[in-house]
Structure formats: C-alpha cells, structure tokens
Amino acid sequence: MVTTYIKSDLQLDGRQFFQPKDNLKMAELFMECEEEELEPWQKKVKEVEEDDDDEPIFVAEIASSKPAISNILNRVNPSSHSRGIKNGILNRGFTASFKPTSQRCLNSASNPVAALPVNFHPESRSSDSSVIVQPFSKPGYVTNSPRVLSNNSSELLFDLTQDTGLSHYQGGPTLSIAGLNETSFLSKRPSGSDISSVNPKKPKPSENTSGIDASSVISSEKSPSVISLQVVPSQGANCSSSQSKNGTTFPRACPKCDIHFNLLDPLKNHMTYCCPDMINNFLGLTKADNLNSANEAKTLESEKGKLIMLVNDFYYGKHEGDVLEEQKTHTTFKCFSCLKVLKNNIRFMNHMKHHLELEKQSSESWEKHTTCQHCYRQFPTPFQLQCHIESTHTPHEFSTICKICELSFETEQILLQHMKDNHKPGEMPYICQVCNYRSSLFSEVESHFRTSHENTKNLLCPFCLKVIKIATPYMHHYMKHQKKGIHRCTKCRLQFLTCKEKMDHKTQHHRTFVKPKQLEGLPPGTKVTIRASVGPLQSGSSVTPSISPSTSTLQLSPPEPDNVTAKNHVKLTTSTPNTTISDPSKANETKSNGSKSKNKSKVSNMQKKQSTLSSSNKKSKVNTALRNLRLRRGVHECIECSSEVKDFANHFPTYVHCSFCRYNTSCSKAYVNHMMSFHSNRPSKRYCIFKKHSENLRGISLVCLNCDFLTDVSGLDNMATHLSQHETHSCRVLVEQVSVCIPTSERLSEIKTEAPTKGQEPVSKETARHSRAEGEPGASHSGSKQDKVPSSEEGTGCDASVCEAAAATHCEKDVTVSDTENVSSSKNILSHDPDVGTDTMEKEEKTHHACQEMELKVDQSSESTNPTEAELSSETRQGLQLTSGDVGIDQFLRQGDEPKSVNSDASDPGSVRLEPLTPSEVLEYEATEILHDGDDPSANTSDTVSDQTGGSPGGSNPCRAETAVDLADGEERS
C-alpha cells in the first residue's frame, strides 16, 4: 500500500484563501491515496483538445488566469472512506470523502452540511469559487463529462468512476483537470515523488481571496493503477471533449475472440497471448506518443530542479562509430569439418552456429538441457532455463529486464538496484571491432554486423564479438568457446577464452561511454529520478497483493503529526531506491530516517507474501487433478523409481519428454535417473534405477541358435539388433539360479568362454557317458589302484574339464541327460559353487582346516609311492580316451581352459585351485596331496563312493572320484 500526502498552501499577499472559522493560520490540503489493486488504466497526459479518456476517474476544474501544473493521484479502496469521519461529521479541517453510495458530505470542522450537492462559495471580488461534490443515485453509474455551472465560477469537481453511465453538468469555459486517457498506460508511469508548482498571475487583492500555489506530487512507482490530473485551460465546448472522444466504454471485448473484459489489465494480458500483433493498434499506442509524453514529463520536472529519466534513456544508448565504406570482397569460406563451401561470411557464421547445435545434440550432454541457446548461459536445471527464456528472450518488452545483461528480475525495484550496482549511465559494452559501432544491446551490434559487413572477409564470434578474417582460425576459436575453461563477464553476456581478455573488457567497456543528452547542461546538485518505465506495472511485479476490487476513495484531511508524514514519505522513496526525492519540509526528511528500515521490512514481507501466494496458486492449478485424486489406503510405490509416493502432486509434477530418445515420464526422480544413466558422458557414475531388482536379472543369458552370438541381460538391445539383421536366426534364453554373492563379471566371463552352441550337444553326450561309466565299476577298481594318482597339474586339469562339462549340461535347459544321478550331482556342484568364491572369511577358515587335516595325515603315513611322470601321463591319456569316447582331444582340452566348477569342501585339491594362494602354498598342497593319495587310498575310495550315491555335501568331489576310476581302468588294460 502506497500512501501519498500532498501539502498545498493557498495564499495570496499574506492572506489565506480558505480560512475556517476556528482561526487556523494556514489551511493545508492533505490527500491520502491508498492503492489496493493493480489496474492499468492510466492514460497519456494531453490537453483537452486531444483527451480521449475512456474511464475518467477524477476530474477537477479550477478557473484561474494561468494554468497550474497537474497532480497525479492514486486510487484508493472505498473501505477507507470512513477514516477521519465519525457519525457523519468530519473531525476538523476541510474534507471531502467519496463513497460508492448515494450519500456524500462536504463540510468544514465547525459547519457540517448533510445536503447534497453542496456548493461552497468563498467571498471573492474577481471570481466565484465553488466546490461541488457530485452525488450518485446508484453506485454503478459514472460521470464522464462534467461541465461547470457558471461562466465566471472556479469549481473543484470530484468525480468517481466505478461502472458505466453518464451524468452532466452544464456550464461555460473553465480550467479542466482531466484524467488520463487509456493510450498512456504504457507511455507514462510516474514512480517517484515529483513536486512541481507554477505560481499563477495574482489577481487583485481582496478580503478572503488568495493566489493558488499548486503543488503536484507524482504518485509512487509501486502503485499499480495511477490517475494523472492535469490542469489545462479550456474554452467553450472544449471542456466536453472527454465525452465526445471517449470511444467505447468498458466492458471491452478482444478483437479476435470477442471475449469481454470489465478491466483493461485482464484484457491486455489476454491479448498478449491471443493477438499480440493487434494490441498496439487496438489500444492506440505509438512510439511517438511514448517519446512525446516522456519528454514532456522530463521538461516539466527539470523546471523545478529535478529530472525524471527512464532506465532506457539513462543507462542504454548506441554510438554509430566510424562511417566507412568497406569494400565488398564476396569471399567464399570452406568448412573443414563437412567440406561445405559457403558463399559469404554471414552464411558461414550461420553454418557454424548450425554445427554447434548439431554437436550439442549428438554429444548427449546434460549441458544441452541447461544452456540457453540465445545468450549461452548455463542454469542449474532445465526448468530454470525455460523460465529464463520465457521471461527474457521474448518479443514482448517487459520493464523488469536488464537489456545489457539479458536477465529478468522479479520487480522493477530489484531491477533498479541491479542497474545502480552494476552499470553506468550511457554504458555500451558491445562493440563492433570493424567500425567501432557500440551499443548497450548485443542484438543491435549483431544485426549491425550482419547488415553493414555482409560480403566481406570479417567473421564475427557470437561469444566474445571478436572479428577473424580466415575460416580455419575462426572455426578453432569458435570451438574453443565450447570448453569449460571459459571466462564469463559478470556484467554482460560475453564470454572470453582468457582471464586477461575478460578483465580488459570490464575495465575498458563497462563504464560511461557517452553521457546521456538529458544530463548535459544541468546545474550541479540536480536530483535525477530513475524509473523503470512510464506505464503501469505488470501484474506480477506489484508490491502489494491484489485483495479488493479496484475502487477509489479520496479523502481530504487536515495535517497529521510529522511521524505519519515521514512514514508515508519513506514509502515513496522505497519505490525508487536509487533516487533522492526532495521534500518541501526538511524536518520530515530528517525524521523519516528512523522509520525507513521498518517500512522496508514491511515492503519485503509483503513481497514474500505475494510470492508465496502466487506460487501456491500456480501449484494448485497444475496439480488440481492429483490433489483431488482418491486413493486406497496403504503404501503406494512408484513403478518407475521404486520409491514410496506420499504426495502424488509433488511426486508427479509434470509430464516431461526426453529430447534424446522416446522416453516420457511424469516422475521427476525417474527422469533424472534416465538422463544420468543413458545420456551422461560419465558412465562410471550412472544411476541404476533397478538396483533393488538387479539380482533377479543375473544369471540370464541369450544365445543365438544359428550362430555364435552370445550376450547377457545388459546386451538385450544387441541381441535384438542381431536378430533384426538376421531374420532367419532365433535365440534362446538361458536362466540359471545365481546367488547374490557371485559377482556378475565372473559369471559373464564364464558364459562368454564356453564353447559355441553347435558343440554343446557332443559335450553333453560325453558328460552323460562319463557319468554312466562313473556308476558301474567305480567302487571296485578304486580300492586297489588308487595309489597311482597323476601329478597335481594334470589331475586337476582333468577334474576341471569333466566338472565343467557337467556344469554346462545343467546350465542349458534344452539339453537332457538320461542319468538322474549325474544331474543331481551336477546340481549339487552348482549349488555349492557360489559358496566358495566370494566370502573371504570362509576361505580362510576352510583353508586353515584343510591344512590341519593334511598335516595329521602326513604324520600318520610312513611310506609314499610316486610313479614316474611318463607313466602317469600315458595312463592319464588312455583314461581320457576311454572316458571321452568319440569326442576330439582338441575340443575336450579346450574345455579345460574354462573356469572350474568346484565343491565347497576346501580339503579337495580341485577347490584349492580357485583360491587366491601364493606359489608357496600351491607347492605345499601339491606335496600333501601326493602323500595323502599314496598313504590313505581307502579314505578317498570311501569318499568317492559316498559322492557317487549322493552322499553328504561335505564329501569329495565326484569328478575327482570319477577320474580316479578311469585311471584305474586304464592301468589294468595296459
């Protein structure tokens, strides 16, 4: 809420003009205007001949020999009409209060008058002065064209507008204080407290008359709807021009969709989206009118020692530079990247920009979603980037945008503070290095280069405005700007490759280049008021929240204490933080310092409340359907991110599309995981969204039945691509129960090193035969021939090959094995496989236990027999030939290189091979194995028999016993 007090001392030759009966020495006129609603209906100040006021809010007419400069007042809420009035009687002074009802009152402190209308005629020789308060029979009618009652009267007529209607007063030529027409709501927005007064020509002295010292106060910038009153001379029928040139009254309709609006602000906001090309013509706004009204305001204010300037005139400007006729060369440029030849420099620059966009799209970088394509700034999130583009890089000009930085701010007050802290008057940081053309706007320099330096050798860098004349260095320079080591200027949009270039740019170019013309020739000490715009504030930049409908109450009250005046004066100064506003009373200015901090805190609190209200309204509009959604009781889990959904409106804020692929989602977490997992440059830091369910996918592999192509779960897309390329091929899914403790990479290496699919059936046949041979003569032969065991290397290799063959038969579900015992034993092996390899503590315990057992057996044995290596090798080969049948030796030995499938018994030599042992430990186990096999063959035989019959899982490996039986058969036959 912005409150303005206007103090007007009316005196002539030391005598008072209005002198009440309570013998006050001076009648002081205080006008309090409270603004509660944003309504941009303020119009351009014109003389009566050109006045086109469609909605006159306040009209006053004063007859005088010379016109006085006008006042600009604010509209107020009718809820404040009772202030200073008690039981229909004013407290003191000379007060007129307007109400939206039919009752109106005008009286002095001692003589209240209840009848309406009331004419107050002070005694005067030269002219009669009357004050008329116009009654309203209904609150919804408006007086559009007031006329005076007599030719020689001086009237002050107050007129309130709420709706449409007409009421007339007839009279002759007078002076008119006319409200602004609707064409000036964009061309003039008074923001500071600007005081200007003109002393009219003094008439002859009389008893109760005095001259008029008209003091005008321009309303605060933070008042969204402003009424401008101008005292202008009017003669004859000119006083009724506001009625004849009013045009259509509200409600108005959109010219495109014919939707009716009662207020101008909603209509303007609607037209910006519906028909932005028709808004200027529809509202009758031209650039010339804007400049004329701004120049008139500056001229009037400069007469009183104060200058009011706009941000565009004070900070922005351009310099034409050197006027040189550059020779057109029509040089062609070749792109070394795509080898395309461009006809001129402008086309080559466009081609490089196109290359940059393609590179960003193909790089799958997260920066593409957060970098502005207009000013190349980076933002934390794509949402902030979208907000920046919509608020800054738009065809519509907003009064909260810094055109130098190309940034948008929340309010005009924040913009003014930013301009004061970062920029200088007449600052032009963007320079054309060819002709020294300068401007405060980057777009002007770029368009100047494209028009003035076309068909030349010059190539302009859009990042730092550097000019290069050769294509290859220009491309290298252009691509260097894409690296992360660039240096951005904090006061404009340029970015440089070195820190020195950035510092030179800041010191040389971010300062006043050309002093504004309005500041030339001003006397020292002139106070300059800077405003963001002359039109009304945008709907989102008002300081006070819109609570009540736009109605106006004007209250004339006697002087109040100084502290109240000081507080209201501070409210004016806070609207323009970089301006010092003069006040007629020095005492009020000194006393206002104490209350300045309090009022600033109030303004900030109101801004916070308004922002929270607007944000909550936006959120409620977006999530209306989700907030009203009825759900069942219990825990709801998101199927995309596997997290609990507590608030559906917050968990699913909006529907987003991935720009790289066809992924669409409403879950914000799932979108972030998708972008980081599939479109990030760092695969090591990818987020796995299926972390909880990843163990279920392990052990699944896909194999092509027509070729050797094999892949795991992570290569499903590769298998799909393979099958699409080979239409005759088909694949099979192999599922294996894999424990969580086995790492995935170990299993993948095991699958990928297996034999091709074509060779799997012979291997399974060999395994089946091998298992049958295992059950028939195994127990009888192993008792007597167990002392001839081959060396640890060959024996272990044979065991591993046979066990791996058995494991392969279990992994493939399509291969059937006739021997049920062998299948059960292979499952037993696979079930114990995971318990061996990963748990370090179990390894150490089992290894320590095995060492103790072997040491005890070595102590008990007294003799050991070691057959020669040649005999063992020949016996082993014979045994392998018998067991392998028709399987080739190359194919069989190839399986020996595969990872071993071992039992959980750590005392078995086969399982020891997989443990991470040092060479010394390996030698120790080999020695103890030989001693153990030679000394106690009966123990191994019993273990073998127990394993073959499906004994306890703690026994020896059946593959080991199987190999021992085959070796024994080979010895007998030899």
UniProtKB/Swiss-Prot annotation:
Residues 571-587, 612-624, 817-829, 861-884, 938-950 have a biased composition (Polar residues). The keyword DNA damage does not apply. The gene is Znf280d. The modification Phosphoserine is found at S557, S904, S907. SUPFAM superfamilies: beta-beta-alpha zinc fingers. Transmembrane segments: none annotated. GO terms for cellular component: nucleus. There is a cross-link at K44, K46, K86, K99, K138, K201, K222, K245, K287, K304, K752 (Glycyl lysine isopeptide (Lys-Gly) (interchain with G-Cter in SUMO2)). A zinc finger (C2H2-type) spans 333-355, 370-393, 400-424, 430-453, 459-481. Its main location: nucleus. Residues 188-216, 507-624, 751-797, 815-974 are annotated as: Disordered. This is Zinc finger protein 280D. Residues 539-557, 591-611 have a biased composition (Low complexity). May function as a transcription factor. Keywords: DNA-binding, Isopeptide bond, Metal-binding, Nucleus, Phosphoprotein, Repeat, Transcription, Transcription regulation, Ubl conjugation, Zinc, Zinc-finger. It is found in: Nucleus.
